[in-house]
């Protein structure tokens, strides 16, 4: 089974990203062969910035994305969205990478389920 998560919201300020990134590793835990891809778009690309510092006791989206990667998932970012926000490849957390609409289209076609947050 392949699930694609498309995340549009900023990493903090709403709980959409938080909830998406809680569900992604839960799917892999229930089904170890489950393939998860997280595609970050719009303000969602900010979720993959390296070295996030959140208050003690507050969730950290970078750590949550690392759990996706540890479960053999992928974290892809819309390159156009990155450019619009002045985010460079060097600012990304390890394992996350710039992507394209063509790759998103291919990933969408290959996915069994697509969840949009």
Regions found by a protein language model. Name each.
Residues 54-80:
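A glycine-rich helix N-cap at a beta->alpha junction
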């Amino acid at each position: 089974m392949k699930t694609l998560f498309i995340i549009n919201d900023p990493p903090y300020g709403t709980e959409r990203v938080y909830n998406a990134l809680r569900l992604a590793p839960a799917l892999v835990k229930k089904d170890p062969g489950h393939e998860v891809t997280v595609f970050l778009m719009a303000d969602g690309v900010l979720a993959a910035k390296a070295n996030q510092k959140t208050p003690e006791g507050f969730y950290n989206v970078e750590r949550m994305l690392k759990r996706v990667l540890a479960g053999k998932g992928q974290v892809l970012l819309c390159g156009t969205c990155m450019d619009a926000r002045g985010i460079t490849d060097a600012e990304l957390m390890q394992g996350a990478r710039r992507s394209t609409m063509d790759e998103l289209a291919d990933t969408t076609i290959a996915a069994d389920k697509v969840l949009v947050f």
